[in-house]
Design a protein with these regions (language model features):
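Short, amphipathic alpha-helical interaction segments positioned at domain boundaries
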Residues: 382-397
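Short amphipathic alpha-helical interaction segments
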Residues: 351-363
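C-terminal scaffold of the Radical SAM
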Residues: 2-3, 24-48, 53-351
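A short, conserved structural fragment
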Residues: 366-375
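Local cysteine-cluster metal-coordination motifs and their immediate loop/turn environment
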Residues: 11-24
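Immediate flanking context of iron-sulfur cluster ligation sites
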Residues: 2-10
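Basic amphipathic alpha-helical segments that dock to polyanions
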Residues: 345, 361-367
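Minor-groove-contacting beta-hairpin "wing" of winged helix-turn-helix DNA-binding domains
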Residues: 376-380
Length: 397
């Protein structure tokens, strides 16, 4: 059987954060219940189409999945187990906001088969949390983290963010050190990206121009400060026994996120819910992002028969040609510290990697941006600092 991972999008949140540009919004319980029913209809439709797949990862993301009733999460998990071939040791994750967690929810998640939590802390500084528009305090996070451990969760990720307005390296490291002392199994550390259409963009757009131009900034950390934060955090994580296995992700040995690795290695994945994307047999599908349209399409989803290519939830279906597949293989694979292997490339495409990328690899190796060793090709320490440049070299005209 082929491998598959499933992503379930829960778009709801209590309040949208100042920096957030994800597909998320507040809603009442009636709207949430209608949406859950839509997700169930989608699962029932796809189940028979995915009968030749075995599910190794399920990821419930958002939005804030922990903002909806825990019994609805349990119902969704029951639907997943009923409709798909879920492996006994599958990684099953849910994203949580510390401000919407409780012992009751954590027990319900555990009993529903969820075995991994991804808790969005972002900062251990309450002033920074308030600036970000987060609805929780650091103290709430610690309380719920300890409850999660007490009820039996043995795989917990904590999300952190650096490069916040007015943040110094010492402030970021204070957060890093507090989290390390809690010994989570996995840590994700992302630099703040100020996106258009967010409240942060309106506040800091002129600072962004200065930042991109290498000029002195008023609120946002400059490039050198961001670099110092990243490297200081990286050293602290690694000194504490975490292994950096991807650009922004650190894990204790054996606790790497399988869902992330599946994405970076181009495993097939099925996205359920509004705005969700899927990749099945090198065709990328995208669901509608309009809630009313999504619910209407879910009501008539079976009208198209059993052909995934004609499922009326999709507003786009793009076939990825061989060139695009190779490019994705390289720039997604190079995000991981172990990089890509010659063997995996040849197995995927029936041709040696040197036949396609020899000149590019040799050039980047000469610039000391790539390391080629024992069949592996991966970013050097210098290459990691200019990763976007390196990955762009594998985009063929």
């Amino acid at each position: 059987m082929k491998n598959l991972e499933i992503y379930i999008h829960i778009p709801f949140c209590v309040r949208k954060c100042e920096y957030c540009d994800f597909l998320s919004f507040p809603a009442d319980d009636d709207a949430k219940l209608r949406y859950v029913k839509g997700l169930m209809a989608e699962m029932i439709f796809y189940g028979p189409l995915m009968k030749n797949y075995q599910v190794f990862s399920v990821y419930i993301g958002g939005g804030t999945p922990s903002s909806i009733d825990e019994q609805w999460i349990a119902a969704l998990m029951e639907g997943v187990f009923d409709c798909f071939n879920v492996l006994p040791d599958a990684e099953i994750s849910i994203e949580c906001n510390p401000g919407t967690l409780s012992r009751e929810k954590l027990l319900a998640y555990r009993d529903a088969g969820i075995n991994r939590l991804s808790i969005g802390l972002q900062s251990a500084n309450n002033d920074e949390l308030k600036l970000l528009g987060r609805i929780h305090t650091f103290e709430q996070f610690v309380t719920n983290y300890e409850v999660a451990r007490n009820v039996g969760f043995k795989n917990i990720n904590v999300d952190l963010m650096y490069g916040l307005p007015g943040q110094s390296a010492s402030q970021y490291m204070a957060t890093v050190n507090k989290i390390i002392r809690l010994h989570p199994d996995h840590i994700s550390a992302y630099s703040l990206i100020v996106e258009k259409g967010t409240p942060f963009y309106e506040k800091y757009k002129f600072d962004m121009v200065r930042q991109e131009a290498g000029m002195r900034t008023e609120f946002l950390p400059n490039e050198d400060e961001l670099y110092d934060m990243e490297k200081a955090g990286q050293k602290a994580f690694m000194d504490a026994g975490y292994r950096q296995y991807e650009t922004s992700n650190y894990a204790k040995r054996g606790m790497e996120c399988r869902h992330n690795i599946g994405y970076w290695t181009r495993a097939d994945y099925l996205g359920l819910g509004i705005g969700a994307a899927s990749l099945i047999s090198n065709v990328r599908y995208t669901n509608t992002s309009d809630m009313d349209e999504y619910l209407s399409r879910c009501r008539h989803i079976h009208d198209v028969g059993d052909d995934i290519f004609r499922a009326n939830l999709h507003v786009a279906a793009d076939v990825i040609d061989k060139k695009g597949q190779m490019e994705e293989f390289m720039f997604l694979g190079l995000r991981m510290n172990e990089g890509v292997t010659r063997e995996a490339f040849e197995r995927a495409f029936g041709i040696s990697i040197d036949a396609i990328y020899k000149d590019t690899i040799d050039s980047l190796k000469k610039q000391e941006l790539l390391v080629v060793k024992a069949g592996h090709i991966y970013l050097s320490e210098r290459g990691k600092d200019v990763a976007n440049y390196v990955m762009a070299q594998f985009l063929r005209d």
